[in-house]
Every structure is written in C-alpha cells, then in structure tokens.
Amino acid sequence: MRSSQNGGAMGGRAAGTGGGGPSAPVDKEVDYAQYFCTYSFLYHQKDMLSDRVRMDAYFNAVFQNKHHFEGKTVLDVGTGSGILAIWSAQAGARKVYAVEATKMADHARALVKANNLDHIVEVIEGSVEDISLPEKVDVIISEWMGYFLLRESMFDSVISARDRWLKPTGVMYPSHARMWLAPIKSNIADRKRNDFDGAMADWHNFSDEIKSYYGVDMGVLTKPFAEEQEKYYIQTAMWNDLNPQQIIGTPTIVKEMDCLTASVSEIEEVRSNVTSVINMEHTRLCGFGGWFDVQFSGRKEDPAQQEIELTTAPSEQHCTHWGQQVFIMSNPINVEEGDNLNLGLLMSRSKENHRLMEIELNCEIKEASGNPKESFKKTYFIE
C-alpha cells in the first residue's frame, strides 16, 4: 500500500500521451521520463495488484457481467501486467486488444501466454493514440484513475480510444465516476505548521551565520524561501488514509462524469460550487479530504446485470493505494455543528506538467443562523 506523501503515479496504467490538447503539446520523451517509465517496473505493478479493493471491484465487474464480454471484442487501455485483459478473455471475450505504452507489454505478453490466452489476447506495445486496430470494439476497459480521480490525465487517452474504436453500442468499464470533497479534522495540520516553522527557524539561523561568517546578507531571499517551504509543507496535497471519524461535515460531489460521453475539455478544468454542513460539535476545520468513486453500470440501453462500485472513500476496513488527498489549512478554524461551508473549487492542470493538478479553493463559513463567520481562499497542488 502507498504511504508516502506523493511519489510516482499509482492510479492508472501507461496508455498514451493524452492530456496536452492543441493548447499544450506534449513532449513524448519528457512525458515518458516523468510518467510512463514508472509503470515499466514489476514492483509498481505488484503494488497495484495487491490492492484488494481495486482488484475485487474490477474482478466482480467483469465476472458478474459476463454478458458484456461473452463473444465480444474488448480494448484494454493501459493494460500494465495484463490482468484486465486476461479477465476479459476468461469471461468469454472473442478478442482482446491489450495496449501498453511501456516495456511492461513484454511481461503482459508472457503472462497472457502462460495462462493459455494468447489466442484471444493480443498485447500491443505503443501509445493508444498511435496504434491501429483492425476492428471496432464492444467494450473498453481501463484502470485510468489517479489521485482525486484526475491526476495523471490518463482519462484523455481513454477518451481518444473511445472516440476512435468503441462501437456506437459499446460499453465503458468503468462507466461513471465521481469526485468527492469533505471537511476534516486532523493533527496533520499542526504537524505541518510545526515543520514549516522549523524550516523557517533553520533558515534564519543559516542566514545569520552566512552574514556573520562570510559577510553576505541573505535577507532578500527570506520571502521566496518562505513561499517555497509553504508550498511544500502547506499547499501540496498529501496522501492519507483518513478515518471516517475525521470527516466533520457532509461529503459533497464536486464532479460527476459519464465515461461514455465525457470530453477532454470537461476535465481539463473542473469548476464546482457546493455546500457542506458541519455535523460535529465543537471541532476544528483543519482542511479538506478529496477522494473518488467509479461505477460499473453499463449503458442505459445495455445495463450491467450487477452494478459494481469502486470507492476510495475513508474506511475503517478497506484502504486503497489511492488513499485520499488531504488539503490542509495552515491555521485551523473552530467550527460548530450546523455551520455551513460554501465551497468554490477550481481544479486545472499544471502549466509545467499536464499530469499534475492545481486547485483553488474558496470557502465561506456561515453559522446555522446565517451570520457570516469566516472566509478564506487557498491554493493547493496535487503532485
């Protein structure tokens, strides 16, 4: 399971360049070095294959809905180790095209052959945007989700595959997705504030020593150093495995997607205005937790026989490698049961790396009576 603050991408597989669009061309070599190369290692695949929540959801979605696979053609976008392609074949697919952008394709091909499915599953190494298939497909299956759903921008590649290769009657696995946000309490906020204060104290000691020993005044760099440290300690979202008891207000949906119709422009910039009500007495608002869920529902004209949901919500029993993204506040605020939080969220892609995210969060807190209490605006980074 993932326990580090950030680190390499963990949610989706390596499928294609995606993400750039005409306004932001993607350098494929840079993109490979920053993103794809991580997925070419078996230890990374093992981490994901060890996530029982993830594995059980996809396994049940496929095998409890065999009618979507039996005798059908399937495209697995970003196959990684090949597990979803193998399951699709075992569920009765006539042909499975398993696309993988990295050398992990060699391992997937070996795994497919070892499971006697190489007459059904064809592993294709390459970007899904660049490959060509001999036919349209009935199903597109992919595990494309990143932190807070959209980090990594891999869904761009799934959209490209869908628009090129999915039949008009085809289904998407998963079919729908949602992003959630909720106010939380956590001692992480205090710990990170202490870390920031410690870094600044160390800087001031360093600055004094440089001036004392070497006669150079470093004071002009204090402000940019503070901004740098604040981004690292306070503004960068953290991976965390939240306990449900840390949620102090109603979780709210900030984005819903139909994977059959969603467009790249729809996810390049996510805007949402929602309200959360504090439901805990005498507590502190220390930040916000963000997570996602996806559904395997088929399509309206061809629904799943058994709907399956994969959720990364805080749980006492089940942790996923995605965890939750925590957006901490440098100065927690005392709140009371019944207080209303009017939230405005804007999530966009980093200008430096389209697979990373920037979030602007506006919050206006009102008492249950409607009287204004406090308001703030924060910027966060999902890296």
Curated annotation (Swiss-Prot):
Catalytic residues as annotated in Swiss-Prot or TrEMBL: 143, 152
Physiological role: Methylates (mono and asymmetric dimethylation) the guanidino nitrogens of arginyl residues in some proteins. Essential for regulating flowering time.
Protein name (record): Protein arginine N-methyltransferase PRMT10
Region of interest (Dimerization arm), residue spans: 190-230
Keyword Lipid metabolism: no
InterPro entries: Arg_MeTrfase, PRMT_dom, SAM-dependent_MTases_sf
Binding, S-adenosyl-L-methionine: 45, 54, 78, 100, 129
Alphabetic keyword roster: Methyltransferase, S-adenosyl-L-methionine, Transferase
Protein's GO biological process: peptidyl-arginine methylation, to asymmetrical-dimethyl arginine; vegetative to reproductive phase transition of meristem
Methyltransferase listed as a keyword: yes
Main enzyme class: transferase
Comp. bias regions, Gly residues: 8-22
Family: Belongs to the class I-like SAM-binding methyltransferase superfamily. Protein arginine N-methyltransferase family.
Catalytic activity: L-arginyl-[protein] + 2 S-adenosyl-L-methionine = N(omega),N(omega)-dimethyl-L-arginyl-[protein] + 2 S-adenosyl-L-homocysteine + 2 H(+)
GO MF annotation: an example: protein-arginine omega-N monomethyltransferase activity
Taxonomy, superkingdom: Eukaryota
Protein's gene: PRMT10
Domain SAM-dependent MTase PRMT-type span(s) in chain numbering: 29-360
Assembly description: Ring-like homodimer.
E.C. code: 2.1.1.319
